[in-house]
């Protein structure tokens, strides 16, 4: 067990960075001496987050060799994006999730749609859930249908109605703010 521990962990008992992405190797090499091996959910979630992040970095490096001037943007939306919007979309794709905090009127909606469309192309995501103020629910639907080739579903109504809407095939779904749920 000592040899195993020295190979995979620091002297403080922390998993060495180079093994985070190959955690399955650790599980395979771990001597159990006939004992049950238990790995808790939070550990697996932590490892999964790191593996997902590395996968995103690899895909972004492959498809955005020219950075914000990469050709993938030409077929992303039915409009051209400003350089800062492309930058925001690439950032969102690379990190997986983020808040876009630009000033009013600078195209946060377009950046979010571009990021969603890029994630659909690159990672095969099947749905995007948009949470926005109630006053903007149909504005989002209009913008989605204007700038993308997809439909959008506003998820609203009583619980049973919402459950049916969640099962809809629409790529974009707009969720009402908490007070409506």
Give residue ranges: language-model regions:
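Charged, low-complexity intrinsically disordered regions
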Residues: 1-62
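Residue-level detector of transmembrane insertion/anchoring sites
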Residues: 2, 15, 75, 92-93
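SF2 helicase/translocase NTPase motor core
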Residues: 17, 64-81, 87, 106-181
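P-loop (Walker A) phosphate-binding loop of NTP-binding proteins
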Residues: 92, 103, 133
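Short, locally clustered residues in the helix-turn-helix/winged-helix DNA-binding domain
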Residues: 93-94, 117
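Walker A (P-loop) ATP-phosphate-binding motif of ABC ATPase nucleotide-binding domains
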Residues: 97
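Hydrophobic anchor at the beta1->P-loop junction of P-loop NTPases
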Residues: 100
């Amino acid at each position: 067990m000592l040899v195993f521990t020295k190979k995979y962990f620091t002297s403080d008992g922390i998993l060495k960075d180079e093994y985070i992405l190959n955690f399955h190797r650790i599980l395979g090499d771990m001597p159990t001496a006939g004992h049950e091996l238990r790995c808790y959910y939070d550990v697996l979630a932590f490892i999964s987050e790191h593996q997902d992040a590395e996968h995103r970095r690899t895909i972004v490096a492959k498809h955005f060799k020219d950075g914000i001037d990469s050709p993938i943007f030409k077929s992303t939306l039915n409009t051209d994006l400003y350089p800062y919007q492309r930058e925001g979309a690439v950032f969102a794709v690379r990190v997986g999730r983020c808040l876009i905090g630009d000033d009013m009127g600078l195209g946060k909606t377009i950046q979010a749609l571009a990021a969603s469309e890029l994630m659909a192309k690159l990672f095969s995501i099947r749905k995007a859930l948009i949470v926005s103020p109630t006053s903007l629910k149909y504005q989002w639907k209009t913008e989605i249908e204007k700038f993308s080739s997809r439909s959008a579903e506003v998820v609203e109504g009583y619980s049973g109605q919402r459950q049916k809407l969640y099962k809809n095939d629409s790529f974009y779904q707009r969720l009402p703010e908490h007070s409506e749920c």
